[in-house]
């Protein structure tokens, strides 16, 4: 999603609140909870889940392994839920032609660097760069090349844009910023 006028272009970034992250967090939470309950019921010798009789699963080694997988899954699930709650990676890119400033803002993990704010002068932008890696896991990433500071990514690596979409986005941005496009 983006907003545009003659002199300002604001590109909003989604971050970790994507449908796929919600699905993985739910699947991981309930799957690991099931593993932990089966491991615990094999230890107690009572049926905590009616699907599996506890006599069929011996605590050593199956119950211990299932309990370990359940605990590990709950930790990973809680990490996913925290990134969704904190909305890590979301933010915006603001290109202001009138003031000659580019601002890039992202939310990070809580702590000292929770707010990531980068500010550049438009005259320091050398080019808009498209990096393409073909293969089974094709990857197309849009970068902004800054004089003296290297390349700043403008799209996520997991954002699966088609070649036409990435070219369109790069062309519009390069036209707006009045800089050339490079393809690698």
Curated annotation (Swiss-Prot):
InterPro entries listed in its UniProt record: PSI_Ycf4_assembly (IPR003359)
Q: Where in the cell is it found?
A: Plastid, Chloroplast thylakoid membrane
Q: Which UniProt keywords apply?
A: Chloroplast, Membrane, Photosynthesis, Plastid, Thylakoid, Transmembrane, Transmembrane helix
Q: Which residues form the signal peptide?
A: none
Which Gene Ontology biological process is one annotated for this entry?
A: photosynthesis
Q: Note the coiled coil stretches, chain numbering.
A: none
Please classify the protein's predominant subcellular localization into one broad category. Answer: plastid
A Pfam family reported for this protein in Swiss-Prot or TrEMBL: Ycf4
Say if the entry is tagged with keyword Transit peptide: no
One cellular component term from this protein's GO annotations in UniProt: photosystem I
| Record function comment | Seems to be required for the assembly of the photosystem I complex.
Similarity comment: family membership: Belongs to the Ycf4 family.
Q: What is this protein called?
A: Photosystem I assembly protein Ycf4
- To which species is this protein native? Gossypium hirsutum (Upland cotton)
